[in-house]
Regions:
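A short, ordered amphipathic alpha-helix with a cationic face
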Residues: 36, 114-117
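N-terminal glycine-rich anion-binding loop in soluble enzyme alpha/beta folds
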Residues: 3-61
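Glycine-rich, highly charged phosphate/nucleotide-binding loops
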Residues: 60-70
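Mixed-charge interfacial surface used for oligomerization/domain docking
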Residues: 3, 9-17, 22-28, 89, ...
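Glycine-rich phosphate-binding loop signature in dinucleotide/nucleotide-binding domains
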Residues: 73-81
Length: 213
């Protein structure tokens, strides 16, 4: 059977992956010296914690063993596994998965570097499920997903400058001036999977319009 595996940067809630039969590897979040496995709290709870924290949370990639446990079970069940993971330029998650694959004598594990994050990974996974259900084999699905990722562009509007200040990218004064001026930074993921600046806009409405251009 063809199955899909994502990490928790995929924008899927834990309950959603369980319902759809998607395997999910969590990322560890460290906030205020407390380690939380992504999925143990909801997105809203996480955003509330970040908003109330003085510093931004830190994340750590899953270990090779986390993937190895899943890969060995796939081999045991003779499942074909398609892994769609967070951009290799943003995390070492893909490196951990690749190392784990090298430790399993099994050629039915396929690892895709999404070169993206969040909802893009979810879109790719949902499309992969559609292809599987239409009768495509794993290699055909991987080929289609590799083509798909080059056609998707991820943009985001930063609604507040507070997190840039917490992360040390802006001073308190700069953040204050930017907030008063209603500056909204536009960020994107480049073709090679890195975070890049698209520009700045005045006001949320203008920022969203600039993304569409």
């Amino acid at each position: 059977m063809i199955k899909f595996l994502v990490d928790s940067a995929s924008d899927y809630e834990k309950t959603e992956t369980e319902k759809k039969g998607i395997l999910r590897i969590p990322i560890t979040i460290t906030l205020k010296d407390k380690n939380i496995l992504d999925g143990e709290i909801t997105k809203d709870e996480f955003y509330q914690l970040v908003q109330n924290a003085d510093e931004l949370p830190k994340t750590s990639q899953p270990s090779p063993q986390d993937f190895l446990d899943v890969f060995e079970k796939a081999k045991e069940n003779d499942d074909e596994l398609i892994c769609i993971l967070l951009s290799s330029k943003l995390s070492g998650t893909l490196q951990s998965a690749t190392l784990a694959k090298s430790m399993v004598d099994y050629d039915k594990i396929h690892i895709i570097d999404s070169l993206s994050a969040t909802y893009v990974i979810k879109m790719m996974t949902e499309y992969g499920i559609q292809l599987r259900d239409s009768g495509k084999n794993a290699l055909e699905i991987v080929d289609e997903l590799e083509k798909m990722k080059s056609k998707i562009k991820l943009y985001a509007v930063l609604d507040t400058l507070e997190n840039l200040k917490k992360g040390g990218r802006l001073s308190t004064v700069e953040a204050g001036i930017g907030t008063l001026a209603k500056i909204k930074p536009l960020v994107t993921l480049t073709e090679d999977g890195k975070v890049g600046m698209k520009g700045k806009s005045i006001g949320r409405k203008k920022a969203l319009a600039d993304i569409v251009k």
